[in-house]
Amino acid sequence: MALIGVLANLLILCLSYARTAPDRIIGGLECNQNEHRSLVLLYNSGGFFCSGTLINHEWVLTAAHCNRENIQIKLGVHNIHVPNEDEQIRVPKEKVCCLGTMNCTQWNQDIMLIRLNSSVNYSTHIAPLSLPSNPPSVGSVCRVMGWGTITSPEVTYPEVPHCVNIQILHKELCEAAYPILLGNSNILCAGKLLGDKDSCKGDSGGPLICNGQIQGIVSWGGFPCAQILEPGVYTKVFDYIDWIQDIMAGNANVICPGDNF
């Protein structure tokens, strides 16, 4: 009952604010080319399907449900139809999920590391994103980005990545919207209570960036996207720091963080 009261009060506050707030498209506005140097495009013969984040010369972080056959990774992309001079293409040398490459799952432990077949050269449009030093606090304003649809439920895929600011919300808000999350501690709940800003179809695997660090990985949410009291669900990267660092260091017998999901 207490949670219902909190949700009701928050909704009233947001509705009062909405009278003066302009409408926004899903995904916000076109990203500045300088702000998504770590963002990578995942595609195969079927076309683009996910994003990911470059975290060093050899490794990309993305969502486990983005696992596909014959993945190619394109770095340094802005307009998908107009190549940058410093674009680079890599393929996976190794893919690592919490439950093994053959057991990547869409909802639980939605995180995957891709080791690239050769080292990436940093350049004007290519640079890594830092891993988190601390978890984000509720209320933090963070930025999500990707080439996902900018309309919903109809889909409109842009040629350039879009960026939008959203907030870290209480996990209980996501649990209220999606009861399947009860007991899962390895997620972040982020968005806007009014639902006017959100990640959406095609943004999967991309970063949620807070203070210059990757704090979340786009995982899933309601559809149509950007609905009232239906925030996005993001993999909480901070909970996987030890796992990520152990994998990149080549340590054996790596244990993924457990949960009760």
Swiss-Prot record:
Residues 21-24 form a propeptide. Expressed by the venom gland. Coiled coil: none annotated. One of its GO terms (cellular component) is secretory granule. InterPro entries: Peptidase_S1_PA, Peptidase_S1_PA_chymotrypsin, Peptidase_S1A, Trypsin_dom, TRYPSIN_HIS, TRYPSIN_SER. One of its GO terms (molecular function) is toxin activity. SUPFAM superfamilies: Trypsin-like serine proteases (SSF50494). The active site is at H65 (charge relay system), D110 (charge relay system), S204 (charge relay system). Keywords: Disulfide bond, Glycoprotein, Hemostasis impairing toxin, Hydrolase, Protease, Secreted, Serine protease, Signal, Toxin, Zymogen. It holds the Pfam family Trypsin. GO terms for biological process: proteolysis. Its EC number is 3.4.21.-. It is found in: Secreted. Its main location: secreted. Disulfide bonds join C31-C163, C50-C66, C98-C256, C142-C210, C174-C189, C200-C225. Residues 1-20 form the signal peptide. Glycans are attached at N103, N117, N121. Residues 25-249 form the Peptidase S1 domain. Monomer. Belongs to the peptidase S1 family. Snake venom subfamily. Snake venom serine protease that may act in the hemostasis system of the prey. PANTHER family: KALLIKREIN-1 (PTHR24271:SF47), KALLIKREIN-RELATED (PTHR24271). This is Snake venom serine protease. The lineage of its organism: Eukaryota, Metazoa, Chordata, Craniata, Vertebrata.
